[in-house]
């Protein structure tokens, strides 16, 4: 028996052992798998959401009692909407009631109607059972699924017992979905989403709700779990545009500390919506998300940044993921009605400004390429419809040491609407933009310029508040390190500005502590005049640009 057969046999046995533990039910497996021992009575230790507390709960406060009475009074309105769904499914009344709160005994039927699970069950009779059995026999991620199931909603009375009924149903749903949608397979967040559905829906209904949620264009959730999902790119860019517009100082700090590339606030938001805040607020946010669709993601992100503006500007690169999670969790540590009220106001404001949805995705956004690193914004934002540059190493902006006054050229181009900084990238060899390798006959440059007005007419009076630079709006443009094959516009710039005229202004010896880095070595090598003028003759020296760059 060869190594492959031995490994396959071992995996098959491991899979069977895990399945057997769930078939045996609660208290199966090793002692550490048994989980907390059940209480003799849950009467005084379980709140209205099903969360089990270690100590006896205090009596209801007047506010909590009022909220329960209000929820009961709203039940009749939800029953009326369910009874005439075709009339109310796209009405303003449905959205208004979703923000006010969905009664717990209505949430299951309403989620089922919103995700159209009954129709999926009728179209696919018996398919869930087939997918479940196939998953039991061939799942490649059953160990990860088992580990995540053991930590999902363990404080809830449904999932408190290890290998209990709800944990077994959750395992079956995840195994079936892995077999049903191989493109997504299994991701960690799916266990929390499926668990939320299991709180209010039967096992098969919860499975089809998960299928519909990830397949629906309205919710755009599959892009967060699929390696080829194109929705994340558009949502991420739109999020950065919206937050940068409303909170420029916050996003400027995140760019400066390189936190946007380290942990995505939008990705963190999805994680927080699933596991990280109180269950009551989680359910209410999911109610709004299922009704509104992906439009709700931008307002939620905007509120989180707005509430935590001062604390986020103090975030450093030390543990950025943990710090982001803590800040977002603190955002929601307040009254649920207050959060939903601010969310509704933010939704109306963004809808009015057409900032609740990203622009239509471009074809290349559906690829599996990594997410680009955003360029420095300064105090301005990108023009509408623009996209960030391809990913590259994080930029460092050293202070140039000037040895001579660079020549000035007339400014004769038209800026972006609103004075925003535009960044355009072109594929190598694109028509109208010559390839650097073909034009130069030598190594490609290692720097790319953010297009300020028109790249071929870019002036040489580099304006960084120095004694020779009077066009101060140029300080929003900066040098950004990028993949060398993306330096498409260098030949156009060099054609009108010979390198000898510019090198004289940047000829001071380097004192930068990073001159021994691979980037500096590569740039110096490419600056050798072996194949004609080279844009890399622009040496950026010292440590920092003047304040305000």
UniProtKB/Swiss-Prot annotation:
Residues 101-293 form the Rab-GAP TBC domain. Ubiquitinated by a CUL7-based E3 ligase, which leads to proteasomal degradation. Palmitoylation is required for membrane localization and protects TBC1D3 from ubiquitination. One of its GO terms (cellular component) is plasma membrane. A lipid is attached at residues 318, 325 (S-palmitoyl cysteine). Gene3D superfamilies: putative rabgap domain of human tbc1 domain family member 14 like domains, Ypt/Rab-GAP domain of gyp1p, domain 3. This is TBC1 domain family member 3E. Acts as a GTPase activating protein for RAB5. Does not act on RAB4 or RAB11. The keyword Cell membrane applies. Transmembrane segments: none annotated. It is a lipid-anchor. Expressed in pancreas, thymus and testis. TBC1D3 is encoded by a collection of very similar paralogs with multiple copies of each paralog, some human genomes encoding well over 50 copies depending on ethnic origin of the donor. Its main location: membrane.
């Amino acid at each position: 028996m060869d190594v492959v057969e031995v490994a396959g046999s071992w995996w098959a046995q491991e899979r069977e052992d895990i399945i057997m533990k769930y078939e045996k039910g609660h208290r199966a497996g090793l002692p550490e798998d048994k989980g907390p021992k059940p209480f003799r009575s849950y009467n005084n230790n379980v709140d209205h959401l099903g969360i089990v507390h270690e100590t006896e709960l205090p009596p209801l406060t007047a506010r909590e009692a009022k909220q329960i009475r209000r929820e009961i009074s709203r039940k009749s309105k939800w029953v009326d909407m369910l009874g005439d769904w075709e009339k109310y499914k796209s009405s303003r009344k449905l959205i208004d009631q979703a923000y006010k709160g969905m009664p717990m005994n209505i949430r299951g039927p309403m989620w089922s109607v919103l995700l159209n699970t009954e129709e999926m069950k009728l179209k696919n009779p018996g398919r869930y059972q087939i997918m479940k059995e196939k998953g039991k026999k061939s799942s490649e991620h059953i160990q990860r699924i088992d580990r995540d199931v053991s930590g999902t909603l363990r404080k809830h009375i449904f999932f408190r017992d290890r290998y209990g009924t709800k944990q077994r149903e959750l395992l079956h749903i995840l195994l079936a979905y892995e077999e049903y949608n191989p493109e997504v397979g299994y991701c960690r967040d799916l266990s929390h989403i499926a668990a939320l559905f299991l709180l209010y829906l039967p096992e098969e209904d919860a499975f089809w709700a998960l299928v519909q949620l990830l397949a629906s264009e309205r919710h755009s959730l599959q892009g967060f779990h699929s390696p080829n999902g194109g929705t994340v790119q558009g949502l991420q860019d739109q999020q950065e545009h919206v937050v940068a517009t409303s909170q420029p100082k916050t996003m400027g700090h995140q760019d400066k500390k390189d936190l946007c590339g380290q942990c995505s606030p939008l990705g963190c938001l999805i994680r927080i919506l699933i596991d990280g805040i109180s269950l009551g607020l989680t359910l209410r946010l999911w109610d709004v998300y299922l009704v509104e669709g992906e439009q709700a993601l931008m307002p939620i992100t905007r509120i989180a940044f707005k509430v935590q503006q001062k604390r986020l500007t103090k975030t450093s690169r030390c543990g950025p993921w943990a710090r982001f999670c803590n800040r977002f969790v603190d955002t929601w540590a307040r009254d649920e009605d207050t959060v939903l009220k601010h969310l509704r106001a933010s939704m109306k404001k963004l809808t009015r400004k057409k900032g609740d949805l990203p622009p239509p995705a471009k074809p290349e956004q559906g690829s599996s390429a990594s997410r680009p690193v955003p360029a420095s914004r300064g105090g301005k934002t990108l023009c509408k419809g623009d996209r960030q540059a391809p990913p590259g190493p994080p930029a460092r902006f050293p202070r140039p040491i000037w040895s001579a006054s660079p020549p000035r050229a007339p400014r004769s181009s038209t800026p972006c609407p609103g004075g925003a900084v535009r960044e355009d990238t072109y594929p190598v060899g694109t028509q109208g933009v010559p390839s650097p390798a073909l034009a130069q006959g030598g190594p490609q440059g290692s720097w790319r310029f953010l297009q300020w007005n028109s790249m071929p007419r870019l002036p040489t009076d580099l304006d960084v508040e120095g004694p020779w630079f009077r066009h101060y709006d140029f300080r929003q443009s900066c040098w950004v390190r990028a993949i060398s094959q993306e330096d498409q516009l260098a030949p156009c710039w060099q054609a009108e500005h010979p390198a000898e005229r510019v090198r004289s202004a940047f000829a001071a010896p380097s004192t930068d502590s990073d001159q021994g880095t691979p980037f500096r070595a590569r740039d110096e090598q490419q600056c050798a005049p072996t194949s004609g003028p080279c844009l890399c003759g622009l040496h950026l020296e010292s440590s920092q640009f003047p304040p305000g760059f």
